[in-house]
Amino acid sequence: MGPAFTFNGYSREAFAKIIDAGYADAVFAGNALATHDLEGAYFHTSLGQDIDTQENRPNGHYHHLDTINRVRYWGSIERFIEEEGVRDGIMNALVRNGVPYVLAGSIRDDGPLPCVLGNAYDAQDAMRSHLRKATMLHTIATGNMTPSYRVLADGTIRPVYFYCVDIAEFAVNKLVDRGSLASRGIVTNVQDFIANIAKGLGLWVRR
């Protein structure tokens, strides 16, 4: 997941509802997704813009840094959520439901948050531990680590289906070009996509 999921209140809420309904077994993302989601809970902004109106807030460009510093003060995302009374958002839903998440680092990260794995190999190993159980997968890196089938408890062999959703055609095509032939690409805005998924599952989403 990229941080675009947090830039609108409705997409942020939609994914939180999908997690609450038990449809997420694990979430892979980076520092930005967690940072801007927690910023949304703390300041009601993402990248300094109101998550509902997209209006710029005074000194909003500092909000994500203030959020990171506050999380680092408490020592963990879980403690930040507890101590700061966070009651909404993607990270809150993950923590509240006990859904595992892996946050991989980047050379572009501000901060980063305490639980972000700065070593790419450590992050890859952490993702692999969840991929063995996964049935829906995202991103080129994830796709390249994914087996083409899984063996069920009764010995049945079934294919693994996964979809890559991105606003750029290049991203979804690259996953197939690099060998993930089972991948199906969907070129769309992920914010609208995740809201439509939630609606299709019968979950209420404000719009």
Describe these PLM feature segments.
Residues 1, 7, 27-30, 101-105, ...:
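General beta-strand structural signal in soluble alpha/beta enzymes
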Residues 1-74, 187:
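Metabolite-binding pocket within alpha/beta catalytic cores that recognizes anionic/polar moieties
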